[in-house]
């Protein structure tokens, strides 16, 4: 599905000020409404997303309302050679999730999953 109007392909920006009611502290509820950040990490709700990404120093956005298709919370610098290709938003093919997640972390949240499988060749 195409992204909603007003959203960029790289996810939607969140107005985190609405959760930051106590100056520098966030007042988040335990309400489960998962969102997926462009860093490919699932956050339990939008407020937790704001709280946990505020100090990352780069513009992590919400990629989708729901859990991430590809979760990059647990990944290794050393990747196996398994071949389960993923197509990145940069048009490059990544041989597996580990290599894709390393590229996501290297891009500081700018890279996201375009689709499972290989990118279309020109």
Swiss-Prot record:
Localisation: Secreted
Alphabetized InterPro entries for the sequence: Bifunctional_prot_inhibitor, Kazal_dom, Kazal_dom_sf, Prot_inh_Kazal-m
Domain Kazal-like intervals: 10-70, 71-121
Q: Which GO terms describe its cellular component?
A: extracellular region
- Source species, domain of life: Eukaryota
Instruction: Report the main location listed first in the record.
Output: secreted
Which Gene3D superfamilies does the UniProt record give?
3.30.60.30
Write down the position(s) of the site called Reactive bond 1 for trypsin. Answer: 30-31
Which Pfam families does the record match to this protein?
Answer: Kazal_1
Reactive bond 2 for elastase (site feature) positions: 81-82
Name by which UniProt lists this protein: Double-headed protease inhibitor, submandibular gland
Q: Which organism is it from?
A: Panthera uncia (Snow leopard)
């Amino acid at each position: 599905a195409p992204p909603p109007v007003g959203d960029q392909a790289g996810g939607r920006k969140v107005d985190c000020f609405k959760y930051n009611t106590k100056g520098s502290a966030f007042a988040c509820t335990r309400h489960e409404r998962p969102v997926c950040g462009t860093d490919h990490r699932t956050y339990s709700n939008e407020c937790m997303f704001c709280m946990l990404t505020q100090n990352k120093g780069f513009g992590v956005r919400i990629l989708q309302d729901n859990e991430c298709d590809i979760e990059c919370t647990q990944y290794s610098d050393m990747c196996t050679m398994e071949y389960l290709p993923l197509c990145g938003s940069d048009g490059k093919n990544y041989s597996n999730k580990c290599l894709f997640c390393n590229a996501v972390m290297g891009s500081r949240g700018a890279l996201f999953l375009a689709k499972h499988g290989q990118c279309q060749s020109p």
